């Protein structure tokens, strides 16, 4: 698997070099002026913690050296994409101080779902900022930008231009919580029943953004959550349910079902939207390969979390998450981070490390996991 991916990426890199030498407009800037992101904790750059301030502990230790509103030890995929396109990190839409929206906004929040939650954050842990809410925030943001320019309001220096919405990337990395939140309680087969509704909501959101001017959409598929320490310790299973890499077979089969349906739905959406670019990003392929062959990427640990409690094989405890402290067996215990997160695929049993995010980002940028082919690296001048 690792060699197949490497061959594909080598071919994509060759195509990229040829295009840059013969087909690139040397005097152009980025084809895209902004990024508008919709998602959950996999792409939240601080929205959740702006709404519910509390983050502490080892989060952000690798790059930011302190908690930075991200569910990782460092940068996320969206951070790498923004920087590669010559943009600053995306400001969270919910952040009131220090935001700069000239190059887009991030509507993602930790624990968000595609479907509207039927319970509260404090009962289920699910964010109130579902995809529908994020879409409404995007629409209101556009209204405010248009009005601010028309009325020459103060604060224009931190807002994008009125024409930016047709020259932006719209990225979606959401759906994981819809899949995992009910997994332990109702099982894989019952979760699969509502996955078409999840995908339909994503496609519908793309169509609504197209209606207000959006033309380029990138949709990241669902990760192989059957390899996540949090799922491996929280989902009842036998040894027969595990593949040779230690991942849950029935869970990852359901993920594959979701991704196949997502790809098919996006293909149909692509035919319905004139002059739109709708890209399916198979980030699952890279992340699965990272879990299965970490050494091929210069890493050591696949299904073991860097930050957690419990030791081998998963270093994850359902009652003691990364950075938290509680009394276990009459002793105060803290779920601490490892000293070398660059050697781990899993940061906290639920999210990827910066190192894993970097590998995934490089595959997105070189076009090796884009369907149809879409070499994002080629859209900016050197």
From Swiss-Prot:
Pfam families: Lipase_GDSL. Residues 1-28 form the signal peptide. CDD domains: SGNH_plant_lipase_like. Glycans are attached at residues 118, 263, 275, 330. Its EC number is 3.1.1.-. The active site is at 41 (nucleophile), 348, 351. It is found in: Secreted. GO terms for cellular component: cytosol; extracellular region. InterPro entries: GDSL, SGNH_hydro_sf, SGNH_plant_lipase-like. This is GDSL esterase/lipase At4g01130. Gene3D superfamilies: SGNH hydrolase. It comes from the Eukaryota. PANTHER family: OS06G0160200 PROTEIN, ZINC FINGER FYVE DOMAIN CONTAINING PROTEIN. Belongs to the 'GDSL' lipolytic enzyme family. It is an enzyme of class 3 (hydrolase). Keywords: Glycoprotein, Hydrolase, Lipid degradation, Lipid metabolism, Secreted, Signal. GO terms for biological process: lipid catabolic process. One of its GO terms (molecular function) is hydrolase activity, acting on ester bonds.
């Amino acid at each position: 698997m690792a060699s197949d991916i490497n061959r594909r990426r080598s071919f994509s890199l060759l195509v990229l070099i040829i295009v840059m030498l013969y087909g690139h407009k040397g005097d152009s800037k980025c084809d895209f002026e902004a990024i508008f992101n919709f998602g959950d904790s996999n792409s939240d750059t601080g929205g959740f913690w702006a709404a519910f301030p509390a983050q502490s502990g080892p989060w952000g230790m690798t790059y930011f050296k302190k908690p930075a509103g991200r569910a990782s030890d460092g940068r996320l995929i969206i951070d790498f994409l923004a920087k590669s396109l010559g943009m600053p990190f995306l400001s969270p839409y919910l952040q009131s101080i220090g935001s700069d929206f000239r190059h887009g906004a991030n509507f993602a929040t930790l624990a968000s779902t595609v479907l509207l939650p039927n319970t509260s954050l404090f009962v289920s842990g699910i964010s109130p900022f579902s995809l529908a809410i994020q879409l409404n925030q995007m629409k209101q943001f556009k209204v405010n930008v248009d009005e601010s320019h028309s009325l020459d309001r103060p604060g224009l220096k931190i807002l994008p231009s009125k024409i930016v919405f047709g020259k932006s990337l719209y990225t979606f990395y959401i759906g994981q919580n819809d899949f995992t939140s009910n997994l332990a309680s109702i099982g894989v087969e019952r979760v699969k029943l509502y996955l078409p509704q999840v995908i339909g909501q994503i496609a519908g959101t793309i169509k609504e953004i197209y209606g207000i001017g959006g033309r380029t959409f990138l949709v990241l598929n669902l990760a192989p959550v059957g390899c996540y320490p949090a799922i491996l310790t929280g989902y009842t299973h036998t040894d027969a349910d595990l593949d040779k890499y230690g991942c849950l077979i029935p869970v990852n089969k359901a993920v594959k079902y979701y991704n196949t349906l997502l790809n098919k739905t996006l293909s149909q959406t692509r035919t319905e939207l004139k002059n739109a670019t709708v890209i399916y990003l198979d980030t699952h392929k890279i992340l699965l390969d990272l879990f299965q062959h970490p050494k091929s990427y210069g890493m050591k640990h696949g299904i073991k979390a860097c930050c957690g409690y419990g030791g081998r094989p998963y270093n994850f405890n359902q009652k003691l998450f990364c950075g938290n402290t509680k009394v276990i067996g009459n002793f105060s215990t803290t779920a601490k981070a490892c000293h070398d997160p660059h050697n781990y695929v899993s940061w906290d049993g639920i999210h990827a490390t910066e190192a894993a995010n970097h590998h995934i980002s490089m595959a997105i940028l070189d076009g090796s996991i884009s369907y149809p082919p879409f070499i994002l690296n080629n859209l900016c001048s050197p």
